[in-house]
């Protein structure tokens, strides 16, 4: 993942199919922040990857409605524009799979994707389509495509 601090972080994220609405090199929806690499046991990577693979086989693409633009951050974090997303039934079910890994200081799941610095949200799509789930372990990332419909 791009951004300061991510090189030491462990998370599970959803990756979108388009990037025209963001200024980030690798836009994502953080499904669960697990913690810092040094604070989690190394074997957790295998557990996260297994759960992500199972989730990818169980879920199809997620087309999630955008509610609007909001500002996130502050304190020791830069303030950014983010697209707030509807917590759909499918998204919440996917999040529940990974709840036990939550190492975030925020207990509530607040689905959003970062656009860039404040004032940079010039394109606001109606929905964002996510077709992959990724396990991010610092600079390492493994991604799985969601189940695709038979053609």
PLM regions: where:
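Histidine-dependent nucleotide/RNA phosphoesterase domain, centered on the 2H-phosphoesterase fold
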Residues: 1-151
């Amino acid at each position: 993942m791009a951004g300061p601090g991510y090189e030491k972080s462990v998370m599970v994220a959803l990756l979108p199919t388009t990037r025209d609405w963001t200024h980030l090199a690798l836009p994502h929806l953080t499904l669960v922040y697990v913690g810092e690499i040094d604070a989690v046991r190394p074997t957790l990577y295998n557990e996260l990857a297994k759960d992500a693979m199972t989730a990818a086989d169980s879920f199809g693409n997620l087309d999630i409605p955008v509610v609007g633009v909001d500002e996130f951050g502050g304190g020791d974090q830069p303030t950014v524009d983010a697209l707030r997303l509807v917590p759909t039934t499918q998204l919440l079910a996917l999040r529940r799979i990974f709840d036990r890994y939550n190492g975030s200081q925020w207990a509530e799941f607040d689905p959003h994707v970062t656009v860039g610095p404040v004032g940079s949200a010039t394109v606001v799509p109606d929905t964002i389509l996510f077709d992959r789930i990724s396990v991010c372990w610092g600079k390492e990332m493994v991604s799985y495509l969601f189940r695709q419909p038979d053609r």
